[in-house]
Design a protein with these regions (language model features):
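Alpha-helical multi-pass transmembrane bundles of energy-transducing inner-membrane proteins
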Residues: 2-72
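Interfacial and helix-entry/exit segments of alpha-helical transmembrane bundles
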Residues: 7-17, 64-120, 128-142, 165-190, ...
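Membrane-interface segments at the starts/ends of alpha-helical transmembrane spans
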Residues: 36-38, 119-134, 217-238
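Predominantly late transmembrane helices and immediately cytosolic-facing juxtamembrane segments
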Residues: 54-58, 131-170, 233-264
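Transmembrane-helix bundle segments that line or gate the permeation/cavity pathway
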Residues: 101-106, 139-164, 187-213
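Aromatic-capped, Gly/Pro-kinked transmembrane alpha-helices
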Residues: 197-241, 252-359
């Protein structure tokens, strides 16, 4: 479910914001203004960034649903040819949400990383261990985010149409739906290219969290946050912008030189009865990662192997059950629902009684 994937991704980004705020609190606790300001600034800036690229992703997912009437990625594929603008904007959002330059998702995470790294040299052993583990955790989160959204973008927009849900799509969504996505994509790019202006903005709420008067006499602090990090981030973004521009020019030159597209079947190891189902799915793409986390998932597979020289039927079905969700989260939710249903009598439609409850 494409939208459910985005909803779970919001939990991940809230956790990144929490890491930033936690780093800021550690900086306050241990009297390190650099760590405090960088942590709070990164966390608050990521709140803004998340509100931009996640809206873009949900708009793109809604456009896909409008045209295909399904949110199941396993039924899609090949939409890039039919919905090129939506596909491109979804990829832009995916790059931003993975924390890659030159888009805004990179900026907040960079500040959080910088805060943790700057806190390592002058920290006690307990803080040192916490920061090292936090850096490793944030790096692992970024890796899983890239795995997640390369899957989402690739399975949804690349390859060939898997079902009739995609076959009937003839054109992209109307301009009135594309314009908001273009604006959000531009904002994500603009913040990534010129982060110093937005760092100055988030310094206002950061100054309320950090006792600015205590560090006002330290001119180096102001230099670090208003100039140094902003310029470093800007240099990073310009470097990657030039890199992407060179790649784009090479791609355009290739199109001009070789305009004729060559279409051929995928090599099937001698099996020549291939169809659009014989391609990667979301489950098969994530299979290697899931296999490394066997204790957390229950895998149930159904296989019918080809036995004849010219097999007529063969299939492989895989069901993955989240053990934590099935045996911990769902029982707690069911117990919570049973408990709260006992209070249904309070909701009787009487406004006067509701006012009395408020009083």
């Amino acid at each position: 479910d494409l939208k459910r994937l985005l909803a779970y991704s919001s939990i991940e980004n809230v956790a990144i914001i929490g890491i930033g705020i936690g780093v800021g609190m550690l900086g306050l606790t241990y009297g390190n203004p650099y760590v405090a300001v960088l942590g709070f600034a990164g966390g608050i800036l990521h709140i803004l960034n998340h509100s931009i690229f996640k809206e873009l992703m949900f708009f793109a997912a809604g456009s896909v649903y409008l045209k295909t009437h399904t949110r199941n990625m396993e039924l899609l594929g090949g939409l890039m040819k039919k919905m090129p603008y939506t596909g491109l904007l979804f990829i832009v959002g995916s790059i931003a949400i993975c924390g890659l330059p030159p888009f805004n998702g990179f900026i907040g995470e960079f500040l959080i990383y910088a805060g943790m790294i700057m806190g390592i040299p002058a920290s006690e052993i307990s803080l040192f261990l916490v920061l090292i583990l936090s850096i490793a955790a944030l790096g692992m989160v970024g890796t899983m985010a890239m795995l997640c959204f390369t899957k989402a973008a690739g399975i949804t927009f690349l390859g060939n149409p898997r079902t009739e849900c995609v076959e009937h799509v003839n054109e992209d969504v109307p301009r009135v739906m594309l314009i908001p996505m273009v604006i959000l994509a531009f904002l994500a790019f603009f913040i990534g290219m010129f982060p110093q202006y937005f760092i100055s903005i988030v310094m206002w709420p950061v100054s309320m969290l950090v006792n600015v008067d205590k560090y006002a006499a330290n001119p180096a602090l102001d230099e670090v946050f208003k100039n140094t990090f902003g310029l470093i981030l800007s240099d990073f973004s310009w470097f990657f912008l030039i890199f992407f521009a060179v790649v784009a020019v090479m791609f355009i030159v290739k199109l001009i030189v070789n305009r004729k597209a060559r279409i051929s079947n995928t090599w099937g190891c001698g099996y020549n009865r291939l169809n659009n189902h014989v391609q990667y799915t979301g489950s098969s793409y994530a299979n290697l990662f899931i296999s490394t986390l066997k204790p957390l998932f229950k895998r149930v597979s159904h296989i019918k192997k080809p036995k004849e020289l010219f097999p007529k039927e063969a299939y492989y079905e895989l069901e993955i059950e989240d053990i934590e969700e099935a045996y911990i989260v769902k029982p707690l939710v069911m117990w919570d629902e049973k408990f709260l249903t006992k209070f249904e009598r309070i909701q009787n439609g009487n406004i006067q009684q509701y006012i009395l409850f408020g009083l």
